[in-house]
């Protein structure tokens, strides 16, 4: 009841006290859900390991464990959990998808594609698996094969933002900047809060030396989300290339204050006025 009422702290206390009296799989399952909801990932991981030992034939336990490992960026453990789920239930498309995602996290593109393909064979409309396979193929510069997956996704949903962004990256990589710009613009029109759309479009403008357009675009992005650290970062880069050193320094300072973890990524970015593209969530 405490869980349903939005009192996770009290729910954790109740479940923990119940488990101190007796190990119960169902209670453990409820507690693991609360841990995940409250981002207590280490506790969730440990509890799911206990659940797996208590009842080792539950596929769902290993799938949940694999998802927790993904959030922890522990791809080795994620692969192990997904592989265990496959051993229990070979035909589970989600298990193959999670193993493919783990392999991608381990930079094993070939095996990632193999398991994602298995997931798609098992579930033809598995959009997430197709998108991830398209990303893996794009990393390997297999653009035609990647486009087959993207086309399949867009045939189901013409406004799938992730597929449109990836198509834009492929168009950009293959020299069709106009088509890339159209895809990025379409995403920002569909969803003005899609940060990646603004980043890709602004980065494209910077590469094309359309610096006033890039700055204006990032002005808009920051107006929509004043805590958008990467937008400050990219606007600062555009300002420096446009001759506004003071404005660039100010934007860089704000970006670092908003996201201190990115200090290393920012280092040296402006000193050489580099026009290199920044990494993005698709890893491209």
What are the functions of these language-model segments?
Residues 22-23, 56, 90, 124, ...:
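Short coil turns that delineate tetratricopeptide repeat
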Residues 241, 246-284:
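Terminal, low-structured helical/coil segments at or just beyond the last alpha-helical repeat
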């Amino acid at each position: 009841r405490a869980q349903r009422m939005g009192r996770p702290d009290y729910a954790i206390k109740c479940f923990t006290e119940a488990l101190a009296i007796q190990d119960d799989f169902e209670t453990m399952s409820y507690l693991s859900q609360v841990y995940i909801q409250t981002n207590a990932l280490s506790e969730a991981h440990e509890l799911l390991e206990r659940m797996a030992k208590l009842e080792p034939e539950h596929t769902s336990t290993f799938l949940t464990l694999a998802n927790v490992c993904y959030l922890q960026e522990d791809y080795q453990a994620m692969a192990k959990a997904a592989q265990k789920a496959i051993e229990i239930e070979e035909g589970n498309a989600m298990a193959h998808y999670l193993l493919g995602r783990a392999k991608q996290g381990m930079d094993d593109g070939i095996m990632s594609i193999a398991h994602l393909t298995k997931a798609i064979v098992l579930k033809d409309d598995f959009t997430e698996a197709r998108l991830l396979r398209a990303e893996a193929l794009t990393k390997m510069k297999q653009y035609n094969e990647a486009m087959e997956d993207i086309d399949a996704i867009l045939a189901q949903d013409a406004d799938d933002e992730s597929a449109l962004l990836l198509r834009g990256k492929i168009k950009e990589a293959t020299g069709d900047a106009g088509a890339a710009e159209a895809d990025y613009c379409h995403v920002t029109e569909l969803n003005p809060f899609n940060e990646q759309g603004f980043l890709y479009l602004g980065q494209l403008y910077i590469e094309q030396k359309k610096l006033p357009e890039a700055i204006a675009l990032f002005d808009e992005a920051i107006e929509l989300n004043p805590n958008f650290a990467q937008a400050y970062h990219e606007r600062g880069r555009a300002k420096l290339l446009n001759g506004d050193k003071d404005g660039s320094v100010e934007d860089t300072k704000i970006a670092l204050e908003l996201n201190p973890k990115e200090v290393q990524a920012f280092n040296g970015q402006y000193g050489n006025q580099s026009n290199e593209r920044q990494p993005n969530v698709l890893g491209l």
